[in-house]
């Protein structure tokens, strides 16, 4: 079994801290920079490559990172995870989201059930249901087809599926696989549900309620909101709703739903896009075959993550460089910058995925750690971000590492040539220019116009955004975050930080408050 140790107790981490710092502006200039771009690239699945030429690493740093990976037993820990070890120690649970898209190791059983078979069965049940909806076997009370699917969930039940839907919506339109338009209700703010309900024809809408426990306050509140709207429209809510929940939740056998599809406690919400949580809405929106392609891409990237050779494992390498930046170079955050409008909500999903996983101040044994853990994650699609927060990234007092994502081709293919280049070429020109500008900077006697450079970045480059490549991209970040949690010796698979606020909110609603909580409640007229 692998040994779990704090990062700062590892001899190889101490050695890494003493390696000479790379002067990025120097090594990325001229012929040396050109050679780095060619050399520092690792193939990923589905035509992607992870290029880290503009990171503050060289062969000496990379060798130190390889040694750190070996001492931290990253490959061994991942192997234990996918073979069914209890990695989520805080909740005494397995971690099985990779098993929803493929089996990397041995059969994994929990509670007497083969979990791979369980996930495959749920995917098949969802596929059968979605096909019946699409071919008109399952309809509304008037015998008319459902045209819209609306997911009701929050956190991982919303951010991931929403980001994946938006990433593929235009691809599906282009490829004639958009079966139903999808909408999402997440916030308990009544304006969220009201706005969505005002925008859809509820008589032809199918609602997907997602709650593992069946007791999530925000989700059940929004369900009641939707049921009231259906009632006012003279519709039977039970004929317009399905549930995605656990087999032991109060929703599982309720007559309030057309069908129930199951998830389990071994998959955290933020890792659930490849489970029934994402499977139901994406299969209804695009068809089961498209969802299967998405899983195929994720499974292909998972296989690369199991490689013990760091230089052939893009997720492990990305994780190691990120920890080097956080714990040796002292950088506080990471900006995720996809140069694809289809990935407009991908940074928001990664924000939850990363910050909820590794935003921890105690290790797996409940002991305080004396080093920084998860960074602050934020981002926007390019080129919009360039006209927003890039000013701080270029000339601010903090250095923020950057993670670009770019594609050679657009999804829709509709384009126009203006001034000798297409819009897609202009988009790609901008990302290439930004990488070099951040790394190399520009000297100017006017200090206000001077760019120091030395701002590190990486880029994941692909041909185009498809279901398979989206799956690979998602798995890359999921597994990167997992490896970083291993290095920091934190439990990346629980989220106790979200619980306290929920408890206090219930006290406020029950009017069981005093002190500052009561005064704030009074100010908000609760």
Residue ranges and their predicted role:
Residues 147-155, 207-213, 333-340, 377, ...:
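Short glycine-rich or small-residue beta-strand-to-loop segments that form or flank ligand, phosphate
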Residues 128-136, 142-308, 507-510:
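Glycine-rich phosphate-binding loops that contact phosphosugars or nucleotide phosphates
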Residues 164-169, 198-202, 224-226, 258, ...:
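Short, solvent-exposed amphipathic alpha-helical segments in soluble enzyme
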Residues 229-414, 453, 500-526:
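Active-site phosphate/pyrophosphate-binding segments
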Residues 458-526:
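C-terminal helical/tail subdomains of lipid-metabolizing enzymes
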